[in-house]
Amino acid sequence: MNQYDGKIKVSTLNSDMIRQINEIQRRNPNKKLYVEIPNTRGISSEMLRQLSPNISIRIEGAYDQERVSRLGDVKYDTGETGEYYTSAVIYTRNEAIRIISEMEKIEKGLEGQNFDQFEKVVYIYEKLKTGIMYDPKYEHKLSKDIRSLRGFITKQTVCAGYAVMFKEMMDRQGIECHYVSGVTNKGRRTCLEYCNN
């Protein structure tokens, strides 16, 4: 994992919290810090622009501490271990801005619609399916490239990336969604969404 000098864990970001984080960074200019948030619900790309460019952001999403600890002994062909999931979802401020900007573009299509939860799920699924290419060559890339939200930027991913991105989009909509994985010879990741309809 990249070496960080400290982590600031918060349940969400708002303008007041961003000011406090920037002040911590200002007082510790030689420290490499990251902010950890459970997901990006309620966070806009414009809000992140207020954050110091020196701060990185870990968006837990599918990789909360419980999952990371369960995967600690897993070893991938690339040599990565399950612990790598902690750093795979740490983004530079600029990466996070780009990722959220792409999610906001998808969400723009929901504005003015009277979609129920199921219709939102289908709409977002279709947008991810048509806007991001499944690339089997990506299976041999590092976790940070395929098991993260970076597919919103690269427009390429594999099943694990789709599931992570879909889960994040559901979190942003307040729709309960769980990242599901298992151990097989040919693993595939998927999300289960729960709709109240």
Predicted segments with their positions:
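Secondary-structure boundary elements
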Residues: 93-151
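Solvent-exposed loop/turn segments at secondary-structure junctions
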Residues: 40-42, 130-135, 139, 157-159, ...
